[in-house]
Amino acid sequence: MKNITILGATGSIGTQTLDVIRKEKEELKLVAISANKSYKKVIEIIKEFKPKYAVLMEENAFKIVEDFCVNSKIDTKVLKGMEGMIYISTLEEINTVVTSVVGMIGLVPTIKAIESGKDIALANKETLVVAGELVISKAKEHNVNILPVDSEHGAIFQCLRGNKKEEVKNIIVTASGGPFRGRKKEELIDIKPEHALKHPKWNMGRKISIDSATLMNKGLEVIEAHFLFGVDYENIKVVVHPQSIVHSMVEYKDGSVIAQMATPDMKLPIQYALNYPNRKESQIEPLDFYKISNLTFEKPDMDTFLPLKLAYEAGKKGGVMPAILNGANEVAVDLFLKGKIEFLQIGDLLQECMNKFYKSMEATLENVISVDKEVREYLGKKYDI
């Protein structure tokens, strides 16, 4: 039996993780959850799974859930804020922490969980993007597995198993291309949030959907792959694959390319991470090769989708530059969703902040938190948010 904590239990990945646990109750036990403010969903989770702990970040939501548990005579202990997230990430009984919160908020709990010897099922891209070197070194120090939950890194992880790192030539990360695949910059001038939120293949949260539309999501995955698999940026390629059947590939120096293929369903990488190193019965629809008409691959347009290009630049620059990129992107996406900036301005703001805030300094926890704060305060004042 593996005991599980889910950080971000009410979001897209968290909800699908619950689906996996629901079907594997003999092997997986939900011990603790966290959420921001979705108290109705948290109450439903508590009713069904009866976790020992639930953490809410927002004060009002915390009080509502706490009152519910007291009045319903449910034993779930309700905690609040970052202290609560760290507490449920470091519980002695926990084997695996699923980090599916979005943004920088997942960084500190993830590091604390690693220091406590917990395996990490990582769905929070930002953690590795802003502090990849620190996270990977701590994982090695504490003999902890970092198990990628997203489909691309989960695919690469599987393609690498049983092979030697020195035999790898290239990692090939596939991208659906998002809702605006094939469009040129002039065709993206009047894009509204409702257009960008309509992903052709995946059902995701709002922030990740916008990142997919700008190809920033793929840029973050490139940086993540660099740290996860120890591969130079020159050897990490992005290929647009609109069918989303091939989830990523590894090219070896002898010319062999190993690909991981599956129906596009996040429950597969979640299930693989939670059960690693074992495989369990499938919870997804199997591939029917007779129904797949074709598989196509295209080169990404980095001039139109500037964030992908900037992610490569930030990764190669290293230090705190990925943290600057990430902080600027989180704010820019929020500004776009609120109608304060245009779609193409997202890339412009990333470029502006990378130029303005870069300092030659090591990506320590203190430094990345500091530069992230600077970027957010600057954009907050600029746009009065």
Swiss-Prot record:
The keyword Oxidoreductase applies. Pfam families: DXP_redisom_C, DXP_reductoisom, DXPR_C. It is an enzyme of class 1 (oxidoreductase). The keyword Manganese applies. Pathway: Isoprenoid biosynthesis; isopentenyl diphosphate biosynthesis via DXP pathway; isopentenyl diphosphate from 1-deoxy-D-xylulose 5-phosphate: step 1/6. NADPH binds at residues 10-13, 37, 124, 126, 205. Its cofactor is Mg(2+); Mn(2+). Keywords: Isoprene biosynthesis, Manganese, Metal-binding, NADP, Oxidoreductase. It comes from the Bacteria. GO terms for biological process: isopentenyl diphosphate biosynthetic process, methylerythritol 4-phosphate pathway involved in terpenoid biosynthetic process. It catalyses: 2-C-methyl-D-erythritol 4-phosphate + NADP(+) = 1-deoxy-D-xylulose 5-phosphate + NADPH + H(+). NCBIfam families: Dxr, PRK12464.1. Belongs to the DXR family. This is 1-deoxy-D-xylulose 5-phosphate reductoisomerase. It comes from Clostridium botulinum (strain 657 / Type Ba4). The gene is dxr.
